[in-house]
Every structure is written in C-alpha cells, then in structure tokens.
C-alpha cells in the first residue's frame, strides 16, 4: 500500500444524544472492493524512515481537510512514536497551528518501536511529555486514547494528565474485564479521575441503544460508536 491507496473515513463523537455532534474522528483506512480497514500489517512493516514519511503525508492531508471543511471539528490519531519525533512535532506546529481550535490530537497507546533498555524507555517518556507540554502551551488539545490498555496504564496516564484535555476508553476492551459490575467500577474510576482534573471523558465502541442508555445512567456524557454512526468515507466541501 502506498499513500495513494489509503483514504480518510470519519466517525461522529456525540454528547448526551445522537443529535449533538461534538466532532468527527478521522480514521485512516485502506479500501478494497468490499470493505475499508486499518492497514495494520502494512503499518507494522514500515521502516523508521517510511513511518516518518507517512506521518508527514498524514499531517498534510489533515491540513487539506481542515482547509476544505471550514466549520467542522475533527480529531486525528497520532501514536506515541510519532510524537517523540522532534521533526514531526515541528511539522505539526507548522501545518496545524492555525487550525488548533478545530483539531484534537488523540494519542494512541502504541508501544515503542524496537527493544529499549529501562534508561532508553525513560528518555522516550521524557521526550514525549516534553513534546506534549510544548503542544499544550501552544493551545493544541490533546486526548489520551485507549486508556487502561497497553502503555496507557494508570501510572503512565497520571504522568501525562497535566498536558491533556480528554481521556478515552473503548468498550472493545471489555473482554479483558471479568463482569459488568467490574466494568462499571472501572469506568466510574476513570470518569472520577477525569472529572477531578477537569477533563472530558469519552467512551467509544458503543454499538447498541442498551449500551447507550446504560452509560447515560452512569453519568457518561460523551460517546462514540456504531450506534451513533458508522465510519463513512470523508466527503469534503468542493468534492
């Protein structure tokens, strides 16, 4: 897959009910005749140089989307690995700074590329937090995606709280939790943490009305999932 083979889809993030649109999440997808999917194997096969070049392309494509859709608000996933790159941070500031009020950067919980010593891992975490602080001071909105999984453990999330405005939890991780009661306690713990820090808490992966109503009873306001809208090929003004 080269850069001509992938496209952006978008999925709504809503507040309280399906009618209140907060923003759309941009999703990188590879299209085939029958479906569109995230190209995981291709992503994992990239060299460091290819990885960086692909992110340059993503940054420029997102800028084009923002310029063509002047009133829409979006979010885009960027991995921790991309945000430790000083060159990519410079490109983000150059291309996205003027759109920062309409764009949320969702930081995914992707593990570091390659094997790292404890000291190297500490240096990576420090560089990541420094770059997050830099973007935060410039007025960018940062969100932590898939909290409670992978490298987005409670300890790591706590270390990044000063620089983020949102926490996102996915119900797709429910199979890792034993019972519905455990899940409720888990969600409410994250929700309490977000509220105590003045952060937005979003639950994604919602597929049914029952799930929507259950989360509403728990006091969870911001939601995302197939129930509110399946990812759709992004249509830009002027297309």
Place the predicted regions along the sequence by residue.
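EAL-family c-di-GMP phosphodiesterase catalytic domain
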Residues: 1-34, 108-115, 147-154, 158-239
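Bacterial c-di-GMP phosphodiesterase EAL domain
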Residues: 1-98
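EAL-type cyclic di-GMP phosphodiesterase domain
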Residues: 32-56, 81-86, 99-137, 171-192, ...
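A general structural detector for well-ordered alpha-helical segments in enzyme core domains, enriched
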Residues: 61, 88-95, 124-132, 153-160, ...
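Helix C-cap/helix->beta junction micro-motif
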Residues: 70, 99, 138, 163, ...
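Active-site glycine- and acidic-residue-rich loops that bind
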Residues: 80-87, 140-141, 145-151
């Amino acid at each position: 897959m080269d850069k001509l083979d992938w496209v952006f889809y978008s999925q709504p993030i809503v507040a309280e009910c399906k009618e209140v649109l907060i923003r759309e999440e941009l999703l990188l997808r590879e299209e085939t005749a029958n479906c569109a999917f995230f190209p995981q194997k291709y992503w994992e096969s990239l060299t460091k140089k290819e990885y960086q070049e692909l992110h340059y392309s993503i940054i420029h494509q997102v800028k084009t989307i923002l310029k063509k859709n002047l009133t829409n608000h979006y979010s885009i996933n960027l991995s921790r690995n991309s945000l430790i790159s000083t060159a990519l941070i410079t490109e983000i500031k150059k291309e996205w700074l003027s759109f920062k009020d309409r764009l949320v950067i969702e930081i995914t919980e992707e593990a570091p590329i390659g094997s790292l010593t404890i000291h190297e891992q500490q240096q990576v975490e420090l560089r990541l937090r420094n770059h997050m602080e830099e973007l935060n001071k410039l007025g960018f909105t940062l969100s932590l995606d898939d909290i409670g999984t992978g490298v987005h453990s409670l300890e790591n999330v706590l270390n990044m709280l000063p620089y983020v405005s949102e926490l996102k939890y996915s119900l797709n991780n429910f199979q890792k939790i034993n019972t519905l009661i455990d899940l409720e306690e888990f969600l409410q713990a994250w929700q309490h943490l977000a509220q105590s820090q003045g952060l937005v808490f979003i639950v994604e992966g919602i597929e049914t009305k029952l799930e929507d109503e259950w989360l509403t009873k728990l006091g969870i306001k911001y939601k995302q999932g197939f129930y509110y809208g399946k990812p759709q090929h992004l249509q830009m003004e002027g297309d």
